[in-house]
């Protein structure tokens, strides 16, 4: 599926352009999250990359404050 909307990472505005933001000239990204599938075959690779880059720390105990 081809996404039409883009979001500027500099000013946060949405646009239909695909190259640069017409307001500030910033870089554009696709603001839509990837589709979810319970049969995702790449989840192990994503988890490994998050651990290696430090985004996910498995040694840290999560604190839940109800």
From Swiss-Prot:
Keywords: Ribonucleoprotein, Ribosome biogenesis, rRNA processing
Pfam family membership, one: Nop10p
BP-aspect Gene Ontology terms: pseudouridine synthesis; rRNA processing
SUPFAM superfamilies per the UniProt record, alphabetical: Nop10-like SnoRNP
GO cellular component: ribonucleoprotein complex
Alphabetized GO MF terms: snoRNA binding
InterPro entries for this protein: H/ACA_rnp_Nop10, H/ACA_rnp_Nop10_sf, Nop10_arc-typ
Family note: Belongs to the NOP10 family.
Function per UniProt: Involved in ribosome biogenesis; more specifically in 18S rRNA pseudouridylation and in cleavage of pre-rRNA.
Name of the featured protein: Ribosome biogenesis protein Nop10
Lineage: Archaea, Thermoproteota, Thermoprotei, Desulfurococcales, Desulfurococcaceae
């Amino acid at each position: 599926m081809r996404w039409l909307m883009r979001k500027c990472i500099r000013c946060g505005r949405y646009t239909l352009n695909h190259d640069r933001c017409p307001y500030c000239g910033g870089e554009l990204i696709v603001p839509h999250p990837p589709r979810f599938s319970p049969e995702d075959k790449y989840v192990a690779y994503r988890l490994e990359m998050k651990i290696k880059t430090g985004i996910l720390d498995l040694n840290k105990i999560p604190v839940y404050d109800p």
